[in-house]
């Protein structure tokens, strides 16, 4: 009788034990994203995020604060002397968030171009991401002149390694490439003011 109860308890315990294998529900990969217009729109929305970190008082200091047009008093040192190659401060933010924006745009362009959504929507969203990418590169070339230029989605270590070793491309060549890229988008975006576009989009 005792053996019966032990076997019954053991069987109940084995059938009630938890499984270590879980179905992931809240994690997306590029392979299972970009399936709907909403997902593609979300990817383009993410391209705007770095702008809020670029357009702060730091941009004012990095552009006007180092010229004769503005003097910024500092309690410890002249703020003009606070920006240098050895201590880039706000320049480092421009570089970091500028390239973060480029990375988001490249990811969105690649993902949406391979998306099964309606062609008109796809072309419009790709064009919007390309406009934002061009804007980020415009800011980068305005601040730093010659910068590394790439349009690849940094989706794996091989691409990341190649992009990390890119030399600087001349600002003129970068802007020429951007103009060609933007000209390819002309038919995909509405010819209206941004304030009249849905959601004030590009």
Model-predicted regions and their roles:
Residues 23, 141-153:
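Short, well-structured active-site flanking segments
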Residues 23, 63, 67-69, 146, ...:
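Acidic side chains
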Residues 37, 41, 49, 75-144, ...:
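Conserved, well-structured interaction surfaces
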Residues 155-163:
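Short glycine/proline- and charge-enriched loop/turn segments
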Residues 31, 57-78, 150-152, 190-202:
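Short, surface-exposed recognition loops and adjoining beta-strand edges that mediate ligand/DNA contacts
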Residues 18-63, 97, 107-109, 172:
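Acidic, glycine-rich segments characteristic of secretory precursors and extracytoplasmic regions
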Residues 1-29:
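Bacterial Sec-dependent N-terminal signal peptides
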């Amino acid at each position: 009788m005792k053996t019966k109860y032990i076997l019954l308890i053991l069987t109940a315990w084995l059938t009630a034990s938890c499984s270590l294998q879980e179905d992931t529900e809240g994690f997306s990969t590029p392979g299972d994203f970009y399936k709907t217009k909403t997902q593609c729109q979300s990817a383009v929305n993410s391209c705007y995020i770095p702008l809020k970190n670029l357009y702060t008082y730091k941009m004012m200091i990095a552009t006007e604060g180092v010229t004769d047009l503005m003097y910024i008093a500092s309690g410890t040192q002249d703020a003009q002397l606070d920006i240098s190659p050895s201590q880039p401060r706000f320049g480092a933010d421009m570089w970091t968030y500028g390239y973060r924006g480029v990375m988001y745009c490249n990811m969105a362009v690649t993902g949406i171009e391979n998306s099964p959504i309606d062609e008109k929507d796809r072309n419009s969203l790709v064009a919007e991401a390309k406009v934002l990418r061009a804007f980020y590169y415009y800011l980068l070339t305005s601040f730093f002149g010659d910068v590394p230029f790439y349009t690849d989605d940094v989706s794996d270590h091989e691409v990341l390694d190649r992009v990390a070793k890119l030399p600087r491309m001349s600002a003129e060549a970068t802007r020429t490439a951007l103009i060609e890229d933007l000209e390819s988008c002309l038919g995909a975006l509405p010819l209206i003011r941004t304030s009249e576009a849905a959601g004030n989009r590009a």
